[in-house]
Amino acid sequence: MQKKVIAAIIGTSAISAVAATQANAATTHTVKPGESVWAISNKYGISIAKLKSLNNLTSNLIFPNQVLKVSGSSNSTSNSSRPSTNSGGGSYYTVQAGDSLSLIASKYGTTYQNIMRLNGLNNFFIYPGQKLKVSGTASSSNAASNSSRPSTNSGGGSYYTVQAGDSLSLIASKYGTTYQKIMSLNGLNNFFIYPGQKLKVTGNASTNSGSATTTNRGYNTPVFSHQNLYTWGQCTYHVFNRRAEIGKGISTYWWNANNWDNAAAADGYTIDNRPTVGSIAQTDVGYYGHVMFVERVNNDGSILVSEMNYSAAPGILTYRTVPAYQVNNYRYIH
């Protein structure tokens, strides 16, 4: 009887050892569409804080195809600040969480305009893991001559593969449609797109696609075409640029954030306490107030916002989720 017990213990220990070895074997995880930091941390038996620490994440925002470290020690930022060289000429930098074009440009003694030119970017959106050219000459492959032609599909409609630097408004302008139509065709309820993503640009929405029509239902939304005169790197500077990117340009004369609700109302915008994708969250709290861009409205009532000069230095783009119970603390400019 004693021998059987010992054998059982040995067998159980062996199985546990194999399971532990298999779990430890996975050191990285490639993010899949729809995944969250919670789901990934739960899968590998680590805390969200540990997962964020391993990958130097400053928010819970992750992107499809992003490679995350799930075991080991945290990445050193000293190596990430050194650009890698390429046999084709020029140096490259891998975007880290919290980076912005201006921040990267200052690291390498160049301008954000030059980095945009080198990489064929036409907006300020970058994402962790993206490889950017920071010196050399612009590659001819950055021209979007081929990518601007949508592929056809036997199921009806045409499709476009998202390139680095694309936005929904930019894609819509290429194909003579609206960003709202593209959102409807693809069942999108926020403005997040990523390189390699396949978007339907013509045809009819599939039966399982969600509708994005609620993003601006019944709202007065004047559109301005002003130059951005807000102070670089401030919350107002970022929100002005994000609204321009989605084709809903705002005035450059609303001054400090604590004046935006009154100024927007005077310009004819709808102001209420209901967040929608693309709206501006505004508060008078603080000396100058604060504004944020609503990127996503979650099913639980919380919202994902992008902002500058809140939890990081001016010019650094950050994301955070505002809990549902705090959503009504803000006014929303539509």
From Swiss-Prot:
Signal peptide: 1-25
Inducing factors: Repressed by mgrA. More protein is secreted in a secG mutant (at protein level).
Domain (Peptidase C51): residue spans on this chain: 210-334
Record localization: Secreted; Cell surface
GO BP terms: cell wall organization; defense response to bacterium; division septum assembly; killing of cells of another organism
Record organism: Staphylococcus aureus (strain NCTC 8325 / PS 47)
Name used for this protein in its record: N-acetylmuramoyl-L-alanine amidase sle1
LysM domain location: 27-70, 91-134, 158-201
Enzyme Commission number(s): 3.5.1.28
Catalytically driven reaction(s): Hydrolyzes the link between N-acetylmuramoyl residues and L-amino acid residues in certain cell-wall glycopeptides
InterPro entries: CHAP_dom (IPR007921), LysM_dom (IPR018392), LysM_dom_sf (IPR036779), Papain-like_cys_pep_sf (IPR038765)
Major location category of this protein: secreted
Protein purpose: Peptidoglycan hydrolase involved in the splitting of the septum during cell division. Binds to both alpha and beta-chains of human fibrinogen as well as fibronectin, which suggests a role in the colonization of host factor-coated material or host tissue. Also exhibits lytic activity against S.carnosus and S.aureus cells but not against M.luteus cells.
Composition skew (Low complexity), residue ranges: 71-86
Enzyme class: hydrolase
Gene Ontology CC terms: cell surface; extracellular region
Annotated Gene3D superfamilies: endopeptidase domain like (from Nostoc punctiforme), LysM domain
